[in-house]
Every structure is written in C-alpha cells, then in structure tokens.
Amino acid sequence: MTEYKLVVVGAGGVGKSALTIQLIQNHFVDEYDPTIEDSYRKQVVIDGETCLLDILDTAGQEEYSAMRDQYMRTGEGFLCVFAINNSKSFADVHLYREQIKRVKDSDDVPMVLVGNICDLARTVDTKQAQELARSYGIEFVETSAKTRQGVEDAFYTLVREIRHYRMKKLNSREDRKQGCLGVSCEVM
C-alpha cells in the first residue's frame, strides 16, 4: 500500500484541524482549540488504488513557526489553507509557499490551495484565489469543513499531485540513465 505524507499549513483559525478531522472522522469540530501539531492516518481508495494518508495538522500561530521547517522537510505534499472570510489568511499563503519552497529547496513541490469556510460570507473572491493558484501552477479547491463540501476533493487532489510529481521524478531519473544512443549507462 502506498503511503502519502500530507501536511496541512495555513494561518491560525482557518480551519486546518476542522478539515482534517472531517476527512478522518466525518465529524465537524466547531470550537476553536489552537493546534500545536497533530498527526492522523487514514486508509482510503483514490482512483482504484488503496492508499495510506499520513496527515500532519500544523500550528498556524506565529509562536510555533520554528517547528515549521522540520515538518516541511518530511512532507511530500502541502494543503495551503486560507479562510475565504479572512483576507489576511489569503495574503499569508504566499509566506507559507515561499517557506515550503525554501525548505524543500525546490520550486516544484506538490501543493493545493484550499479556500476553507466557503459556507460563510466571503472577503476573498473565488476568482482571486483561482488566479493565485494559476500563478503558482497548482490546483485550487473550495471547502467547508462544516458541510463537508470539497473536503475529500482537496486531500485527494493533493494525492494525485504527489503521484504526478513522483512519476515525473522517476521519468527524469530514467532519462538521465539513458545515453545519447538510448543505451542504459551506469556510472561505477
């Protein structure tokens, strides 16, 4: 069974834990209890493949920012979550993305932009979020942990992005092994 290490990042209070718990336990948590760090595991079937999702739900509060580098190093893919009723959390997405790219030392990291709390009045327009995602070259999903709208879609889209990334890396590794005549070469 293939395992995927997913990390949920974003500002405090955007609903990262609520999204994760809704996926794992089919339950909406409506009271806000700031997370330091929680880990969850769930077996799911995505596109016919049985997968084990290892999900790290992270602290959004600034006082825990020193821990971010560590979990960003181990994550394979990232849900960058903002609240559609909080423009500051939308602006903060850029900071999380830049930190992920720095820690991973790559511009090419599997990531999905998630606009959460879509069941409430918005201050961030859907078009703004779509344009930001397009500029980053990533997918955008709107979610509501309360109604469960888009929750599976967000996590499953990230798994598909990780699969795509793994295949791309595997193919580029295979290409490097090929000589100019199409003969496999290995350096001893």
Swiss-Prot record:
Q: What is the recorded membrane topology of this protein?
A: Lipid-anchor
Give residues with lipid attachment (S-palmitoyl cysteine): C180
Q: Which CDD domains match?
A: H_N_K_Ras_like
Residues given in the record as GTP binding sites: 10-17, 57-61, 116-119
Q: How is it modified after translation?
A: Palmitoylated by the ZDHHC9-GOLGA7 complex. Depalmitoylated by abhd17a, abhd17b and abhd17c. A continuous cycle of de- and re-palmitoylation regulates rapid exchange between plasma membrane and Golgi.
- Stretches the record annotates as Hypervariable region: 165-184
Q: Which GO terms describe its biological process?
A: Ras protein signal transduction
Q: How is its activity regulated?
A: Alternates between an inactive form bound to GDP and an active form bound to GTP. Activated by a guanine nucleotide-exchange factor (GEF) and inactivated by a GTPase-activating protein (GAP).
Q: Name one GO cellular component term.
A: plasma membrane
Q: Which residues form the signal peptide?
A: none
Sequence motif Effector region, location on chain: 32-40
Q: Name one GO molecular function term.
A: GTPase activity
- Kindly state which keywords UniProt assigns to this record, in alphabetical order: Cell membrane, Golgi apparatus, GTP-binding, Hydrolase, Lipoprotein, Membrane, Methylation, Nucleotide-binding, Palmitate, Prenylation
Spell out where lipidation (S-farnesyl cysteine) occurs.
Answer: C185
Instruction: Extract the SUPFAM superfamilies matched here.
Output: P-loop containing nucleoside triphosphate hydrolases
Functional description taken from the UniProt entry = Ras proteins bind GDP/GTP and possess intrinsic GTPase activity.
What this protein is called in its record is: GTPase NRas
**Native organism:** Danio rerio
Give the gene name.
nras
